[in-house]
């Protein structure tokens, strides 16, 4: 079907016929207000771009997304002033498409595919070629920021279902530890801490047990679990460095033990969790340090996204500038900007610290052989149409 006019797929997503220059550096420029008013829209561009548009304090965000191309790149120009943009467009050209599944008049699911020069592509652990299809295990499944103890059970089940279907070789975790029990952002909020105490959420030992149990469950789904050093993981190191445990009698003994680990040059979170894990789970887990590179199919997967170059604040732009092809986390908002991709979150979509309109979404990323990627989104626990 050739789309000649804007076409609604349901009440929340439509195909847009807006026409862009193929050399447009960022195909979302100036279009946010269209997504804000009219809903998620898919439109043509030889680049694959995804950007969220917050619309409400309580509703899910809308998205602007471009398709990629089904034609080979050809941006040749004899005009001197066009050669720069032609060169950039050649670099950013993607053979690909967006798959949109419609459940009903409100719910839809989308994910990206990229094709190689022979027309082969991967979707949900299956390789499709011009002559047939076959199972193909993803190289990695990067989960939306995990936040043990604040993980939404519906998102958790969705990712477990995806992992059981596709059997990824490795699962990569961002913000595996939440740090609610020792959160420095809340140390002066006495009434909030009183509420946490009533709910049993100020015990560091219990929070570590929750993470250990989660890691044992996740490790059963894959060959290797990779834990990316993230800002919430570092909450524990900060808690120990500032000796705030002196004011927390319920955490004091455990914190003293972990403080010695820091003095000995060890990662306190790794030490605490390793002691709690069953041996068969522990041997599958790889802990990255803050400066470790970790590449899957030449895609940087070892940076959480909270740090930019030279210790500056991180962003997807800084991930692209530093690493080129990457999959990061931190923002809780799925996004694609050329080779830099960002997953969403696995936590509840409303926490104590994200007030107002939100672009958060349950979203994770599959990395396939050759480096093709697709974001998988879960809406109320559902991630595709049965």
What do these predicted regions represent?
Residues 1-33, 125-130, 283-294:
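A short, well-structured beta->alpha microelement
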Residues 11-14, 125-153:
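Mobile, glycine- and charge-enriched loop segments
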Residues 42-43, 64-66, 109-112, 171-174, ...:
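A structural signal for short, well-ordered beta-strand segments and their strand-loop junctions
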Residues 90, 243-298:
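Active-site-proximal loop/helix segment associated with metal-binding centers of metalloenzymes
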């Amino acid at each position: 079907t050739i789309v000649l006019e804007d076409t609604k797929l349901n009440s929340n997503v439509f195909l847009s016929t807006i026409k862009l220059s193929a050399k447009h550096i960022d195909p979302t420029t100036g279009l946010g207000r269209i997504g804000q008013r009219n809903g998620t829209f898919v439109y043509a561009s030889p680049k694959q771009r995804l950007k969220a548009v917050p619309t409400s304090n309580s509703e899910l965000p809308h998205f602007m997304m471009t398709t990629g191309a089904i034609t080979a790149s050809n941006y040749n120009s004899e005009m001197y002033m066009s050669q720069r943009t032609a060169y950039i467009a050649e670099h950013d050209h993607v053979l690909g498409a967006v798959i949109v599944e419609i459940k009903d008049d409100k719910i839809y699911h989308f994910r990206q595919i990229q094709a190689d020069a022979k027309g082969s592509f991967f979707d949900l652990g299956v390789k499709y070629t011009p002559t047939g299809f076959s199972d193909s295990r993803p190289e990695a499944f990067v989960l939306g920021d995990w936040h043990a103890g604040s993980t939404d059970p519906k998102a958790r089940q969705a990712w477990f279902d995806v992992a059981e279907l596709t059997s990824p070789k490795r699962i990569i975790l961002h913000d595996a530890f939440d740090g609610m029990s020792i959160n420095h952002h809340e140390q002066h909020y006495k009434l909030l801490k009183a509420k946490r105490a009533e709910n049993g959420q100020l015990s560091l030992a219990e929070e570590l047990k929750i993470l250990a149990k989660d890691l044992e469950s996740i490790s059963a789904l894959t060959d290797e679990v990779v834990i990316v050093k993230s800002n919430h993981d570092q909450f524990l190191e900060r808690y120990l460095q500032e000796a705030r445990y002196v004011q927390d009698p319920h955490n004091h003994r455990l914190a003293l033990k972990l403080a010695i680990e820091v003095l000995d040059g060890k990662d306190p979170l790794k030490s605490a969790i390793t002691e709690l894990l069953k041996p068969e789970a522990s041997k599958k887990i790889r802990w990255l340090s803050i400066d470790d590179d970790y590449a899957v199919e030449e895609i940087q997967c070892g940076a959480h996204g909270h740090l930019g170059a030279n210790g500056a604040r991180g962003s997807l732009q800084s991930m692209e500038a530093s690493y080129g092809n990457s999959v990061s986390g931190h923002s809780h908002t799925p996004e694609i900007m050329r080779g830099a991709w960002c997953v969403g979150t696995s936590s509840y979509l409303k926490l104590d610290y994200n007030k107002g309109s939100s672009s958060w979404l349950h979203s994770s990323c599959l990395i396939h052989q050759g480096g093709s990627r697709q974001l998988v989104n879960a809406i109320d626990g559902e991630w595709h149409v049965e």
